[in-house]
Amino acid sequence: MKSITRTDERILQGDIFERDAKQPRPQLGHLHEPGRDIPIYRDCDVLVVGGGPSGTAAAAAAARQGADVVLLERYNHLGGLSTGGLVIWIDRMTDWQGQLVIRGFAEELFDRLPSDAVAGPPPAEWGSQDPARAQHWSLRTAAYHGIVTWSPTIDPERLKLLSQEIVIERGVKLVYHSWACLPLLEGGRVAGATFESKEGRMAIRAKVVVDATGDGDLFARAGAAFANDIEENDVHHCMNTAWLFAGVDMQRWLDFRGHNPDGFNAFMAGGREACGLFERAFVSWRNDIALFMGPRQSGYSALDVDDLTAVEVRSHRAMAAHLDYYRRHAPGFENAYMVLSAPQIGVRHARRLKGVDAVLRSRWSEGTALPDEVGVTPAVSPKFPNISIPYGALVPEQLDGLLACGRHISCDRNSHGFMREIPQCWITGQAAGVAAALAVKAGVQPRLVNIDHLQAALLDQGVYLRPRAGAATSATAKEPACA
């Protein structure tokens, strides 16, 4: 185990636990799969593969722009890790001055969620440096560096339902219980994808495909270049399965944490000794439900089925051990019970696209709007200005017919620490969806979309962008930006 502390480049403190020993897999050779005819399920303008935060935003945005959209999702819900993964703590949507910069589709979600499905500071306190308010909200994952931020926790079931209703309202063809397999390639461009379901293998043909799988499954299988290096001293490469305990009194727990630091430290030390893998409880949207977003496990690959299975098993065992320890030692947890382990494993990193451009650590201090800015993300600390997200980070270096959005966009490993978060996935998803629709309408490849038109359409959909000088006319290929 190693402990990660908060610095100017990370938000949450936490422990990282190393993997168990991996058993070698026997090499048993290969079988030949004969060729076959595959039924065409649907033709469409835009196929979005993956219904997580970025894919949901992409589908809704493309449909709002007038495209015929199909959204393919392997689970029975939308929202991905923000719902099925129980990542219900939504990272900062305001900058360090309290300005809301994660807007557009994300803002629509929070405008439409019921008030009892969201917990967080009121707008009047966003950006506050009042010590009492910062202390209050820091225990509720909504204040960092002594500044109150809009970092709410949400009811995952309500977000599932709302996400589903929004895409249906927009006319998106929603396809659940379907797992994308291989991209369809025509003349060097992506022209759709095959997928598996209870009906067997079928195909969807599309003019533009948006890879919102989170792991770059489609662009990797289509031959696009990608990176998979990690930052060992951060949590961005770890995996775990989150869970919820109910029957708790989180106010008693927060009083214990806030007023008895020695007791809390002793509690955590005892938990590590008793459980091995150990995690502190986080607030949720309700006082009687506790969220556990760890323990974070290092050294596993999100692209290895044996590793994914091992993380699930370790996490489920950790949940049982935590329940016993918390019941005996944690104020407010005497009557706790298991209510849910996440249906989706918490993957933070697998692949990152090598794009025309990238979100780069070297630009953090610049504070200027890039010519092809499609979104703005809050910086990691008050030492840095807001960070510009370029359209080129969604566009593969060479591959046509496809855009990427979500945690696998083009960025370096430092920037991935925040670009993988839920709000940033909403930003890049909305940008990819609008760009895909504009590409179809103009009859051009996504890399040739007119940036002025793209930015105007994003502004019309409520996205926060900044004035910039000399917008590029398109995102053209250049030297690799993401090593």
Give the location of each predicted region.
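Mobile, glycine/GP-rich and aromatic-enriched active-site lid/loop segments adjacent to catalytic centers
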Residues: 2-18, 126-153, 157-161, 169, ...
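Conserved N-terminal/central alpha/beta ligand/cofactor-binding core
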Residues: 2-27, 35, 67-68, 74-182
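Beta1/beta-strand and adjacent pyrophosphate-binding region of the FAD-binding site
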Residues: 38-52
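Core beta-strand elements of the Rossmann-like FAD/NAD(P) dinucleotide-binding domain
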Residues: 42-44, 199-208
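Short hydrophobic core segments
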Residues: 49, 204-215
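Conserved beta-strand-loop-beta-strand element in the redox core of flavoprotein oxidoreductases
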Residues: 184-203
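Flavin (primarily FAD) binding-site architecture
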Residues: 211-226
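Internal hydrophobic alpha-helix adjacent to the cofactor/substrate pocket in enzyme cavities
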Residues: 427-443
